[in-house]
Amino acid sequence: MLTEQQRRELDWEKTDGLMPAIVQHAVSGEVLMLGYMNPQALDKTIESGHVTFFSRTKQRLWTKGETSGHVLNVVSIAPDCDNDTLLVLANPVGPTCHKGTSSCFGDASHQWLFLYQLEQLLAERKTADPTSSYTAKLYASGTKRIAQKVGEEGVETALAATVNDRFELTNEASDLMYHLLVLLQDQDLNLTTVIDNLRKRHQ
């Protein structure tokens, strides 16, 4: 969240008391929507943990999802370099747009969004009927079997590379990635955990 110093340095005068707030998906990086906050909306956002704007139409504070239940759970808030715009990282509950899409900017999705959506699907498969899909059956077979599949797909990926078969390498790498995501979900981990760890190693 914002530090006390960051909050004091926000330039409300420059924005006539209404500061643009860009909301971005905390996991996928997709830009979800743009709204405007006054100091009271920012305070309520921080206190409640749900993104709250000042509605220029309704002339009142408006918490995203207050009617639909599709709230935006705040992960972090950061000002830009001029202290006149906010970047809000949030995890959405349901679609963000009133039209039913994940973003108010249509289908111009971030490529990472597909992996996030795939992870969500895999998480649902964990508790599904084992007869309903290949993935649900794989979860039911247990961690050892899932780990074995990751090993098998890893070997097949490596073999495809050694014979310079780019088509087969792409297919095998896709299978490897899929089964690796299944294994991570099985262990209550996700791709974000891995990415965060890679960032730490890079620093």
Swiss-Prot record:
<comment type="similarity">
    <text>In the C-terminal section; belongs to the PRA-PH family.</text>
</comment>
<dbReference type="GO" id="GO:0004635">
    <property type="term" value="F:phosphoribosyl-AMP cyclohydrolase activity"/>
</dbReference>
<dbReference type="InterPro" id="IPR023019">
    <property type="entry name" value="His_synth_HisIE"/>
</dbReference>
<keyword id="KW-0028">Amino-acid biosynthesis</keyword>
<dbReference type="GO" id="GO:0005524">
    <property type="term" value="F:ATP binding"/>
</dbReference>
<keyword id="KW-0378">Hydrolase</keyword>
<dbReference type="InterPro" id="IPR038019">
    <property type="entry name" value="PRib_AMP_CycHydrolase_sf"/>
</dbReference>
<keyword id="KW-0067">ATP-binding</keyword>
<comment type="pathway">
    <text>Amino-acid biosynthesis; L-histidine biosynthesis; L-histidine from 5-phospho-alpha-D-ribose 1-diphosphate: step 3/9.</text>
</comment>
<protein>
    <recommendedName>
        <fullName>Histidine biosynthesis bifunctional protein HisIE</fullName>
        <ecNumber>3.5.4.19</ecNumber>
        <ecNumber>3.6.1.31</ecNumber>
    </recommendedName>
</protein>
<keyword id="KW-0963">Cytoplasm</keyword>
<keyword id="KW-0547">Nucleotide-binding</keyword>
<dbReference type="GO" id="GO:0004636">
    <property type="term" value="F:phosphoribosyl-ATP diphosphatase activity"/>
</dbReference>
<feature type="region of interest" description="Phosphoribosyl-ATP pyrophosphohydrolase">
    <location>
        <begin position="115"/>
        <end position="203"/>
    </location>
</feature>
<comment type="pathway">
    <text>Amino-acid biosynthesis; L-histidine biosynthesis; L-histidine from 5-phospho-alpha-D-ribose 1-diphosphate: step 2/9.</text>
</comment>
<dbReference type="Pfam" id="PF01502">
    <property type="entry name" value="PRA-CH"/>
</dbReference>
<comment type="similarity">
    <text>In the N-terminal section; belongs to the PRA-CH family.</text>
</comment>
<dbReference type="InterPro" id="IPR021130">
    <property type="entry name" value="PRib-ATP_PPHydrolase-like"/>
</dbReference>
<dbReference type="InterPro" id="IPR002496">
    <property type="entry name" value="PRib_AMP_CycHydrolase_dom"/>
</dbReference>
<feature type="region of interest" description="Phosphoribosyl-AMP cyclohydrolase">
    <location>
        <begin position="1"/>
        <end position="114"/>
    </location>
</feature>
<dbReference type="InterPro" id="IPR008179">
    <property type="entry name" value="HisE"/>
</dbReference>
<keyword id="KW-0368">Histidine biosynthesis</keyword>
<keyword id="KW-0511">Multifunctional enzyme</keyword>
<dbReference type="GO" id="GO:0005737">
    <property type="term" value="C:cytoplasm"/>
</dbReference>
<dbReference type="GO" id="GO:0000105">
    <property type="term" value="P:L-histidine biosynthetic process"/>
</dbReference>
<dbReference type="Pfam" id="PF01503">
    <property type="entry name" value="PRA-PH"/>
</dbReference>
